[in-house]
Amino acid sequence: MMQICDTYNQKHSLFNAMNRFIGAVNNMDQTVMVPSLLRDVPLSEPDLDNEVSVEVGGSGSCLEERTTPAPSPGSANGSFFAPSRDMYSHYVLLKSIRNDIEWGVLHQPSSPPAGSEEGTWKPKDILVGLSHLESTDAGEEDLEQQFHYHLRGLHTVLSKLTRKANILTNRYKQEIGFSNWGH
């Protein structure tokens, strides 16, 4: 029984989640030959109503998958992949995240285009969301709790991003009329 749990944990390790995401984005990048065709094409799929996320047990136990309802419009959970974004925006964002994972995050202040202040991510936003994990007394920090919280978050985000990359790849194939490529 221990062997099954170990294999299951390895299958759902952070490294494997990152590799699945990077592989999905590489596949998307190789499939999308003309990215400009993605402009003004909405990325909508009927099966996106339920997102799949991965839970890490608080005691380090095996992971379990669960389905959660999709975030409501305007909620913080759906901000990166807002319905108003087109396939090209998703394509650029997914490639950017892949590059950040592979090469590290460059700390360059980026100047947003004029009039695009709404809906942009700011570094302080993550600090607001994590403020409940910070303790007033440094000795009271629960590093294990923080680790599991962030690990759960990484697994959830990587699962959703991988799914988005796969959906974008399939939608591109449909848009150009090659829905049976690679099958």
Curated annotation (Swiss-Prot):
Keyword Nucleus: yes
Subcellular location: Nucleus; Cytoplasm; Cytoplasm, Cytoskeleton
Sequence positions bearing N-acetylmethionine: M1
Gene Ontology molecular function, alphabetical: identical protein binding
Coarse class of the protein's main subcellular location: nucleus
Record InterPro entries: Lipogen_MT_Stabilize_sf, Spot_14
Gene3D superfamilies reported in the protein's UniProt record: 6.10.140.1610
Residues bearing the modification Phosphoserine: S72, S75, S79
Residues covered by region (Disordered): 51-77
Keywords: Acetylation, Cytoplasm, Cytoskeleton, Lipid biosynthesis, Lipid metabolism, Microtubule, Nucleus, Phosphoprotein
Keyword field contains Nucleotide-binding: no
GO CC terms, sorted: cytoplasm; cytosol; microtubule; microtubule cytoskeleton; nucleus
Superkingdom, taxonomy of origin: Eukaryota
Gene Ontology BP term (one): regulation of lipid biosynthetic process
Function per UniProt: Plays a role in the regulation of lipogenesis in liver. Up-regulates ACACA enzyme activity. Required for efficient lipid biosynthesis, including triacylglycerol, diacylglycerol and phospholipid. Involved in stabilization of microtubules.
Description of how the protein assembles with itself and partners: Homodimer in the absence of THRSP. Heterodimer with THRSP. The homodimer interacts with ACACA and ACACB. Promotes polymerization of Acetyl-CoA carboxylase to form complexes that contain MID1IP1 and ACACA and/or ACACB. Interaction with THRSP interferes with ACACA binding.
Family, per entry: Belongs to the SPOT14 family.
Protein name: Mid1-interacting protein 1
Species per Swiss-Prot/TrEMBL record: Rattus norvegicus (Rat)
